[in-house]
Amino acid sequence: MTGSSGEVAEQHVYWQRNLWVCTLGSFTTLIAMTLLLPFLPLYLHSLGVEEEASIAHWSAVAYGATFLTAALTAPLWGRLADKYGRKLMLIRASLGMAVAMSLMGMATAPWQLVALRLLAGLLGGYASGSMILVASQTPKEKTGWAVGILSSGVMAGNIAGPLVGGVLPGWMGIRATFLLTGAIIFITFLATLFLLKEQRQPPKKATASAVEETPAAIPLPVKIMWVSGMLLVFASMSVEPIITLYVATFTPSLQHATLLAGIVMAATALGSILAAPRIGALADRVGHWRVLSFGLVVCGILLIPQAFVTAVWQLVVLRFCMGLALGGMLPCITAIIRHHAGANNTGRLLGYS
């Protein structure tokens, strides 16, 4: 009895420690992926891009490159995580991001910056890998809460990235900012290497694994969550590129509109940060399907009045409330997939989500 209790206590300590390491690691790597947004046009200009249209083109390509390759390779890393271990994938991602970010500060041409951004997305994936590890290592009754905490770290990184990128280059220069960011991510690599402990489960027989690989064997709830996750991202992100233009209709100053648009976007992320752990814990108690369904309805209702606001503060309030609803959905989607996934294909199924 004592030995069994000791094993349970040890596992309890490990999953909580893993959660905080993954949350801090996701926070720092998301900062790295988003911090160049404020100074990207200036950096491209220093690399020899002169025309305004060319700067806009290169900015869009360079910024989106990381997220494109990260999305395309997430299922692959999820599959490899199931086979070789989730901790190993996080070590790979943090070390790869540290190297790529440091090299970005040494770029001498726009194409080099784009190539390094592509490389960062290809070698990265720390946040998605953390989601897989936390979801698979956390007790099922705590999955919603744990994923909510991790989601808050991801959202906080998305907010802090542009803020850091707006401050540090003025203090130390753009190239030094990249080098400092690479050094911070290297610390994340060390924390992942020495502090993270994965509780590996013995693999299933080959016949069972082969059955799990067939599309027909994938549980229907998992397929529904894939579609729900795609629609969730589409609904929440599709309007963000035009928020600045929308806000500009309420203020004559374009510079002022940019600041206000940043506040509007931050309001959504702030709402998600505040709501994710609380709604995740609530979903663990009352049911993930119930909370997810309610959140989808609330988001749909909150989207409609955003088209009819007459002042920026109204849009801020609506986007904040929408962030509260959105913050609880990702933990629910992840928890539902986790509950229906086998021990050896959790990473693959979460990677597709």
Q: Where are the predicted features?
A:
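Juxtamembrane intracellular "pre-TM" segments in multi-pass secondary transporters
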Residues: 2-16, 197-227
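Pair of pore-lining "gating" transmembrane helices in MFS-fold secondary transporters
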Residues: 14-42, 46, 219-239, 320
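Short amphipathic helix-loop junctions that connect adjacent transmembrane helices
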Residues: 39-56, 242-259
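Central cavity-lining transmembrane alpha-helices of secondary-active solute carriers
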Residues: 61-77, 266-278
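Conserved MFS/SLC helix-loop-helix module at the cytosolic interface between two early adjacent transmembrane helices
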Residues: 71-108, 283-289
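Paired small-residue
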Residues: 100, 111-119, 302, 313-321
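Cytoplasmic helix-loop-helix junction between adjacent transmembrane helices
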Residues: 116-154, 335-336, 340
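Symmetry-related core transmembrane helices of the 12-TM Major Facilitator Superfamily/SLC fold
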Residues: 177-194
